């Protein structure tokens, strides 16, 4: 036999007007904030990832592949010097 914890049931919560008043404002505003975060380019600045036009610059057009198993550190150093 289980006891009552005194909490409201899930069905009671999602059928209340208070729930929908709060969430009809917060869910769209979170969506809009996320869209603005990505569309303005702020996400690139915050996380430090290159923008789509910065992956391959004029002086670096090759794909950064490591091909050797034993000289991988030299290849990484050579690649990092091209920045």
Curated annotation (Swiss-Prot):
Listed transmembrane segments: 21-35
Topology term for the membrane: Single-pass membrane protein
Superkingdom classification of source: Eukaryota
Required cofactor(s): heme b
Keywords, comma-separated and alphabetical: Chloroplast, Electron transport, Heme, Iron, Membrane, Metal-binding, Photosynthesis, Photosystem II, Plastid, Thylakoid, Transmembrane, Transmembrane helix, Transport
This protein's GO CC annotations: chloroplast thylakoid membrane; photosystem II reaction center
Major site of localization recorded for this protein: plastid
Compartment(s) of residence: Plastid, Chloroplast thylakoid membrane
Binding note for cofactor: With its partner (PsbF) binds heme. PSII binds additional chlorophylls, carotenoids and specific lipids.
HAMAP family (alphabetical): PSII_PsbE
Family: Belongs to the PsbE/PsbF family.
Alphabetized PANTHER family for the sequence: CYTOCHROME B559 SUBUNIT BETA-RELATED
Name under which the protein is recorded: Cytochrome b559 subunit alpha
Naturally occurring in which organism (per UniProt): Helianthus annuus
Gene for this chain: psbE
